[in-house]
Amino acid sequence: SEVVSFSFTKFNPNPKDIILQGDALVTSKGKLQLTKVEDGEPVDHSLGRALYVAPIHIWDDSTDRVASFATSFSFVVEAPDESKTADGIAFFLAPPDTQPQKNGGFLGLFNDSNKSIQTVAVEFDTFSNTWDPSARHIGINVNSIESQKYVKWGWEDGKVANVYISYQASTKTLTASLTYPSNATSYIVSANVDLKSALPEWVRVGFSATSGLSRDHVETHDVLDWSQTSTPAANSDYT
């Protein structure tokens, strides 16, 4: 089957191939700024998401085939007070008509009334909510805001983080790694995820981020570049 791939070394301020939701925008310098910044300072209660416009065929009912994919991106999270950060950024896969959910600790992906939203995410979580581990962490979330697997994350204020996420359909393994080139630290987490049971056949992929719900727990969430390749489940068009 044909490979679906795209690559952004930076983003277009008037993007045709990115769907912006909530507060997300692209700056004049080509940064994908997911949450609101005013006068150079991050704003609380902000939620922004960005989706690649073309849906991806993640599994195929007629053949039972499941797609493999790999995605890489760089992001920066910067906080005015590095002891008080919230709430985080995530890469996610969701139904093509996906809309922003609850802000704050739900990261724009989930909410407390509907626990079973079809969304698979890798979260880079900077605030410990009641359902979270007690430290900043990188988690793999399958249809729940509670991470199925996680690793503690030594977040670096204002430093570029390089992320690589891959899904191997044959072993149903979702793996995420984050590296800070500035100090050569890296973190890795992987989980067994059955995309066929977690998601519909077609999905959109993208990013979601939320700032904290109090004025002193805020941070920026900027994606600098993004590329992805996937070997789809079948040769067919989204209808």
Swiss-Prot record:
Glycosylated. One of its GO terms (molecular function) is carbohydrate binding. D-galactose-specific lectin. Has Ca(2+) and Mn(2+)-independent hemagglutinating activity towards rabbit erythrocytes. Has an epithelium-dependent vasorelaxant effect in vitro. Gene3D superfamilies: 2.60.120.200. This is Seed lectin. Tetramer. The keyword Glycoprotein applies. Belongs to the leguminous lectin family. It holds the Pfam family Lectin_legB. Coiled coil: none annotated. It comes from the Eukaryota. The keyword Glycoprotein applies. Glycans are attached at N111, N183. It comes from Vatairea guianensis. Hemagglutinating activity stable between pH 6 and 8. Hemagglutinating activity stable up to 60 degrees Celsius but diminishes with higher temperatures and is absent at 100 degrees Celsius. Keywords: Glycoprotein, Lectin.
